[in-house]
Amino acid sequence: MKLISTLLALFFVFQVTQSQDSVQSIRNYLHVNDQFCTGGQPRLEHLEMLKKEGVKAIINLRQPSEHRAAEEEAKAKELGLRYFNIPVVFTDPKDEQVDEFLRITDDVNNRPAFIHCTAAKRVGAFWMIRRVLRDGFTVEAAEKEAERVGLVESPHLNEFARKYIEKHQKK
C-alpha cells in the first residue's frame, strides 16, 4: 500500500512539473491553428518553449508598464524572435491599434505568432476582429472562438470588436 501511495505521489509531481514545463501552462493558452496561438502573460522561459514549437513572432498587447515588458522584449530578441508591442489600454482599445495588429498578423513573415496580453481578453477582442475581416468568419462564430481565446466577462471589449467590424466590414 505504501508503495502505491509513493508511486501515485511521484506520478502527481511528474504531471505538475511536466505541465509547468510546456506552453500549455501559459494562462488561457490556445493553439488556434498552425499560424497562430494565443494566451495570457507568458513567463520568460515560455518564450524559449514557444520558439521550440516554431513560433517566429511575439505580439504583446499589454502596456509597457505591465509585467516586466522590457525583459520580455529583450528575451524575445535574444532568442531571435520578432517582437511587437501594441500597447492596448484594457478599458480603451483604439481602432489604430487594431489596424496595426492586422498589418502585423497579415505579414506571413510574422508567422507562426504567439499573441498575448495579461489574460487574453484583449487578444480575444482583436482575434475576433481578425477572424471576421480576414478569415471570413461570421461575427457569431468569431465571437465563440474569441471566448475560447479569453474574451470573457469583458462586454466593453466585445462591443469594441463588434463596432470595429461593423465599420470595416465590406458590404
Predicted regions and their residues:
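A periodicity- and composition-biased signal for non-globular, repetitive helical segments
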Residues: L8, W127-M128
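Basic, ligand-binding patches in group-transfer machinery
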Residues: K2
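A phosphate-binding catalytic loop at a beta-strand-loop-alpha-helix junction
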Residues: A113-G124
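Cys-dependent protein tyrosine phosphatase-like superfamily
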Residues: Q18-A113, M128-K171
